[in-house]
């Protein structure tokens, strides 16, 4: 990165970290432990591996990330929070420096990951094995995957809104297409978390959700509505950024039912098509 661009980036980082501290004063200690690095798209994998080694990231986590990247090779990665026994780092795509709004949204998102990771470590009752995908309770693990992306993006969008930083909002049509894709196609729990955050940010409510779910299977509609209400209640809490094992398990149970009902509906439709063809 050129010197002028690097200086420019450091100024932005300092401003954004200050805004984050104003929203979450307790984050100051966490911010002192995180290093922010940049990598262009062409060198992302190599730079990520180096950062992971410096942070002491567990091999299993590195493999999990590689598998995720392989599944979503056409989806650009703009940032990532990396953690391990030696430290924490945030890796950002150099290209995000082209637009301040995108840069702020991405960095707030990764800082939120770092802050929530720090909060989880402070909580003796939190199932920290979720952080490495090792929770024995499958529902709790599923809930954590949805939650960590939902809360990171929610925090990012909230701060951007409070600080009047312009970000790209999803339209109703885009959100409906996103939801339909999750219902009809293959999705990850992270995708669901991001959808829910974007839906709430666009003043999503029960009525709008019902309109988006028109003509969908009744069981699937009920599953999505339960996830919506669970997250909606969580956001009304004073310390909404903190989660516990009970909440994660409840969320994960809803997600597991959604996946099962999706599969049931797909098999039912396939059977109907076979009957029509015969």
Would you name each region that the model predicts?
Residues 10, 14, 109, 146-150, ...:
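A structural signal for well-ordered alpha-helical segments within the folded catalytic domains
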Residues 173-278:
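Pan-zinc metallopeptidase signature
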Residues 1-80, 257-277:
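A metal-dependent hydrolase signature that marks the N-terminal structural subdomain at the beginning
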Residues 22-31, 121-124, 161-166:
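Surface-exposed helix-capping loop/turn segments at secondary-structure junctions
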Residues 114-122, 155-162:
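Active-site catalytic microenvironments for nucleophilic, acid-base chemistry
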Residues 57-107, 111, 117-118:
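Active-site scaffold of zinc-dependent metalloenzymes
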Residues 155-182:
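Short helix/loop segments within enzyme catalytic domains
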């Amino acid at each position: 990165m050129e010197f002028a661009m690097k200086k420019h980036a450091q100024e932005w980082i300092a401003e954004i970290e200050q805004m984050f501290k104003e929203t979450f004063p307790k984050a100051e200690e966490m911010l002192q432990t995180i290093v922010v690095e940049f990598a262009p798209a062409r060198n992302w994998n190599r730079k990520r591996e180096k950062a992971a080694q410096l942070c002491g990231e567990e091999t299993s986590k590195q493999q999990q990330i590689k598998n995720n990247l392989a599944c979503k090779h056409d989806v650009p990665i703009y940032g990532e929070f990396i953690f391990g026994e030696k430290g924490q780092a945030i890796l950002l795509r150099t290209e995000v420096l082209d637009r301040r709004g995108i840069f702020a949204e991405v960095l707030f998102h990764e800082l939120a990951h770092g802050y929530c990771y720090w909060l989880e470590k402070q909580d003796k009752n939190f199932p920290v094995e979720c952080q490495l995908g090792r929770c024995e309770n499958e529902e709790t693990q599923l809930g954590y995957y949805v939650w960590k992306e939902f809360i990171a993006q929610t925090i990012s969008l909230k701060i951007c809104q409070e600080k009047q930083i312009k970000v790209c909002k999803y339209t109703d049509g885009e959100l409906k297409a996103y939801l339909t894709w999750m219902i009809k196609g293959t999705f990850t729990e992270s995708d669901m978390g991001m959808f829910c955050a974007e839906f709430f940010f666009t003043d999503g409510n029960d009525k709008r959700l019902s309109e988006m779910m028109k003509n969908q299977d009744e069981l699937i509609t009920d599953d999505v509505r339960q996830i919506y209400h669970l997250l909606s209640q969580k956001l009304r809490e004073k310390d909404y950024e903190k989660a516990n094992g009970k909440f994660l398990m409840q969320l994960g149970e809803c997600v597991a039912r959604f996946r099962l009902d999706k599969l049931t509906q797909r098999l039912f439709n396939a059977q109907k098509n076979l009957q029509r063809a015969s």
